[in-house]
């Protein structure tokens, strides 16, 4: 499969042959499994104090008192320790021994990655995610794109190939999160827009654009390509990144 390499002015520089993984079968089931496995590694174990709710001298009265057989405090008839009592232990508290990480076979993980890469050049899947773009995919820039140092230069290059409208879509989608999360460092929700994949680590000019993620081809994973387990993210590649993708 061949693809056009675009200049930063929007013209066509040349044609290149895409790696074989761009022709991989679309497997949404494996993509979902791989993303869940990746997300599970970020979970932290939670547990409660082992003696929470039972640090009390309460004992049951036994039979013959006309009251239920629950532990009661010494200075009265108030129940303690049991889950249904105020200040009592939790019935089924979280335990640190719980296995949080989901496993995935190595070959399944590799196939999910290749499938997510292939989905990034399918216009129907990209449109179904709500992305806005003009022209055809894949979107591949010449390596000069990685040398851009100003955000305005990046905006100009993205406008020239007809994808800046997707960043505007993400910018308009920003809203205050419902619930307690707004008090816990995640006040705003915003839709994902472009994914920019480069060959080098020092491309910082696009990091402040709304919804944009910039990642090197070596650090690229399934979650970058399929946020929310839905494949078909609008992706901008550089020529060197596509070439280095062959070795993944």
UniProtKB/Swiss-Prot annotation:
KW Ribosomal protein (keyword) present: yes
Q: Which GO terms describe its cellular component?
A: ribonucleoprotein complex; ribosome
Instruction: Give yes or no: UniProt keyword Phosphoprotein.
Output: no
What are the protein's UniProt keywords? Answer: Ribonucleoprotein, Ribosomal protein, RNA-binding, rRNA-binding
Read off the SUPFAM superfamilies from this record.
Answer: Ribosomal protein L4
Instruction: Name the InterPro entries on file.
Output: Ribosomal_uL4, Ribosomal_uL4_dom_sf, Ribosomal_uL4_euk/arch, Ribosomall_uL4-arc
GO terms of molecular function: rRNA binding; structural constituent of ribosome
An example GO BP is: translation
Q: Where is this region: Disordered?
A: 69-92
Q: Coiled-coil stretches, from where to where?
A: none
A Pfam family (short name) is Ribosomal_L4
The similarity annotation says: Belongs to the universal ribosomal protein uL4 family.
Give the protein's function.
One of the primary rRNA binding proteins, this protein initially binds near the 5'-end of the 23S rRNA. It is important during the early stages of 50S assembly. It makes multiple contacts with different domains of the 23S rRNA in the assembled 50S subunit and ribosome.
On subunit structure and binding partners, the annotation says: Part of the 50S ribosomal subunit.
The record's HAMAP family line, in alphabetical order, gives:
Ribosomal_uL4_A
Q: What is this protein called?
A: Large ribosomal subunit protein uL4
């Amino acid at each position: 499969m061949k693809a056009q390499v675009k200049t930063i002015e929007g013209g066509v520089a040349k044609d290149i042959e895409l790696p074989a993984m761009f022709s991989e079968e679309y497997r949404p089931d494996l993509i979902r499994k791989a993303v869940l496995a990746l997300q599970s590694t970020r979970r932290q174990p939670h547990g409660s104090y082992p003696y929470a709710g039972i640090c009390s001298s309460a004992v049951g009265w036994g039979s013959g008192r006309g009251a239920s057989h629950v532990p009661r405090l010494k200075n009265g008839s108030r129940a303690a320790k049991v889950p249904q009592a105020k200040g009592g232990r939790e019935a089924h508290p979280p335990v640190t021994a719980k296995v949080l990480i989901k496993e995935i076979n190595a070959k399944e993980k590799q196939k999910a990655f290749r499938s997510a890469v292939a989905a990034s050049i399918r216009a129907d899947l990209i449109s179904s995610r709500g992305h806005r773009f003009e022209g055809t995919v894949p979107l591949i820039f010449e390596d000069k794109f990685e040398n851009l140092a100003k955000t305005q230069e990046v905006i100009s290059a993205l406008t020239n190939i007809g994808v800046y409208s997707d960043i505007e879509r993400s910018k308009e989608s920003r809203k205050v999160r419902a619930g307690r999360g707004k008090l816990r460092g995640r006040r705003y929700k915003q839709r994902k827009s472009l994914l920019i994949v480069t060959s080098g680590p020092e491309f910082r000019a696009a990091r402040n654009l709304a919804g944009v993620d910039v990642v090197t081809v070596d650090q690229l994973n399934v979650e970058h390509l399929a946020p929310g387990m839905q494949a078909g993210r609008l992706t901008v590649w550089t020529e060197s990144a596509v070439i280095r993708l062959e070795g993944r």
